[in-house]
Amino acid sequence: MGVRDNRSSCVDVVQPIDNAVRIDLPCAADGLSAVAPDEADTFVIAGMGGDLIARILEAAPWVKDARYEFVLQPMTAVEDLREYLCNNGFQIVTERAVKAQGRVYTVMKAVFTGENTLCDPLFYFVGKLGENLEADELEYITRKRRIIAKLADDIK
């Protein structure tokens, strides 16, 4: 494959299309209700509020098993999701901040350990982002700091 004399060569798309046809994903399902416990071991739940992600996990009791990994990307209510995970036997293994369209979001990997974690209230606001301080993590923490400072001023 290459470009010769300003002409593109043909690309064989048959194999990628055949592979895509074999992927069977449940559609129009409520949360994980259409997923069987043995269907996958890694789940991505993204693009919704942290409170909804917590409700999705709570509604599927079979996810409380150490063999599953969860990649979670809450758009809002991140604090609520972190609190749910800490209080329901999940551990946040790693967490990163990513910037998209001027907003900074978190993406976390969580696993079930069965042990509830006593988390410092500050953990609900910044999670594990302080462990890997790159530009997006610093921006996320700075934004959270402003929110906390404003809340403190409003209380005065």
Question: What name fits each language-model region?
Answer:
Residues 30, 48-51:
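Gly/Ser/Thr-rich helix-start
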Residues 40-47:
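Short SAM/SAH-binding signature in class I
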Residues 8, 14-40:
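S-adenosyl-L-methionine
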Residues 34, 39, 51-156:
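Class I S-adenosyl-L-methionine
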